[in-house]
């Protein structure tokens, strides 16, 4: 989970609350990355609920890869698991039936790492196109 923690006191509070839960075997906290890893047989929804109640902050599931070598794991997993495509649509518009915020997912990543922004959105010459220093600038100006 991605848990915003400011101090060692917050870290201890989160650790104690999660370790008290039934089914939690181990809690690992990386305060630099703001990441909490819970291992055990506890339900994901209950762990999120306890962490949200303790911190009173918005907590989401970790959507970045834990290790760089794990890239591509999700592709292999979903190809094996979901071979048929499920079409959920109403009047041609796709409808989501899953409450991502309640279950700890934010944005559009849903378990995937965040991709880097596309660096070539604006051509470098586009910003100087209407400059007065440019001898070939727009004749309207």
Curated annotation (Swiss-Prot):
SUPFAM superfamilies: HMA, heavy metal-associated domain
Domain HMA: 1-59
Keywords of the record: Lipoprotein, Metal-binding, Methylation, Prenylation
Pfam families according to UniProt: HMA (PF00403)
Keyword Lipoprotein carried by entry: yes
Protein family according to the UniProt entry: Belongs to the HIPP family.
The organism of origin for this protein: Arabidopsis thaliana
Protein's name in the database: Heavy metal-associated isoprenylated plant protein 29
């Amino acid at each position: 989970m991605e848990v915003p923690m400011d101090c060692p006191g917050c870290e201890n509070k989160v650790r104690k609350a999660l370790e008290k839960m039934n089914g939690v075997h181990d809690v690992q906290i990386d305060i630099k990355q703001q990441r909490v890893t819970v291992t055990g047989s506890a339900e994901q929804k209950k762990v999120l609920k306890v962490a949200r109640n303790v911190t009173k902050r918005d907590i989401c599931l970790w959507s970045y890869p834990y290790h760089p070598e794990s890239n591509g794991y999700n592709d292999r997993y979903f190809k094996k698991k979901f071979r048929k495509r499920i079409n959920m649509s109403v009047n041609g518009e796709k409808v989501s039936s899953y409450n991502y915020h309640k279950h700890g997912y934010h944005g559009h990543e849903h378990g995937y790492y965040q991709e880097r922004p596309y660096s070539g959105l604006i051509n470098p010459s586009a910003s100087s196109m209407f400059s007065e220093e440019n001898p070939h600038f727009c004749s309207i100006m």
